[in-house]
């Protein structure tokens, strides 16, 4: 029986449309703010507001899924995101957009938690890696296509908002034709996120999501700046970023399959080692194409493998709470990593980007090389 059941396929179709909308807005909102002559710090504050919304949305979604189930939680999350999009056209200004991007951030995080939790609850330990790999492939393909759309369509605010809002609402439609069951038993109370963060046997998975956030946040946010400082043109920067993201897309399926077959711990060790090798290759200014490719293939696949590993360590009724904890960890890493790395790059050298990535990866590799321990097979494995 295929792991890609009808509910899974429809869920991923809806996610693709929503990811397109997310990618378009995340690219254009800073440009729209700049056109309104807002100061750089104000543009940064609006971006931070969106990520703050991500944190809040992550914390809220477990309760919503427990009370309403996956389908209705998905509808509500999509409508919140749509409201955050429509609000941008109601009033253009710093404080207004600060609020509406916060709302959009809440909606986006809720969508991610619902989709990831639904996929994990739909799978088993034998196929969860492939399900999450498919999720990440859809996410990165949607991001790539969103960037492509920005380069092909008019980018004026009132030209973009109608069709982006329509795309968000269209993302609801696939789930109207199926029902995703929440297999979390009613007799279990809602599991606190803090207990998942403290769970000793899942700590390597949680730490892996933090490291993944640091690595991906730094690559996404600071790689274009690094390339620019190397004298590379904007067009060429776009090409090299495409190489990086494409490697991440191509790596999802084989690495997910290898993780299901040989175990997540072994695959995580190899991935982190390859990230270190890719960082060293960039520092030595060796052939950039293969260096970026292996960095993207290993770095962009850390999150789903770490997530699947952590989810092996909990019972089925704890999967939603664990997913919240992992997404929260990733978000914290993606906020702190680029901020700290950017300060180091500004004060010392651009090479600190890869030194930082290699350093945090090395620390995580040491954790992975220690005895991970053996725990009884939990219900989530079945």
Curated annotation (Swiss-Prot):
List the Pfam families. Answer: MFS_1 (PF07690)
Q: How does it sit in the membrane?
A: Multi-pass membrane protein
The alphabetical list of record keywords is: Cell inner membrane, Cell membrane, Membrane, Transmembrane, Transmembrane helix, Transport
Q: Does the keyword Cell inner membrane apply?
A: yes
The GO terms this record gives for MF are:
transmembrane transporter activity
Task: Classify the main location.
Answer: membrane
Any signal peptide, and if so, which residues? none
Gene3D superfamilies attached here?
A: MFS general substrate transporter like domains (1.20.1250.20)
Q: Which PROSITE patterns match?
A: MFS (PS50850)
Residue ranges crossing the lipid bilayer per the database entry: 8-28, 45-65, 79-99, 102-122, 131-151, 157-177, 204-224, 235-255, 270-290, 291-311, 325-345, 349-369
Task: State its location(s).
Answer: Cell inner membrane
Q: Which SUPFAM superfamilies does the entry mention?
A: MFS general substrate transporter (SSF103473)
This entry carries the following GO cellular component terms, namely: plasma membrane
Q: Kindly give the PANTHER family that the UniProt entry links to this protein.
A: TRANSPORTER MFS SUPERFAMILY (PTHR23521:SF2)
UniProt similarity note: Belongs to the major facilitator superfamily. YcaD (TC 2.A.1.26) family.
HAMAP family assigned? MFS_YcaD (MF_01149)
Official protein name in the record: Uncharacterized MFS-type transporter CKO_02171
What species was this sequence derived from? Citrobacter koseri (strain ATCC BAA-895 / CDC 4225-83 / SGSC4696)
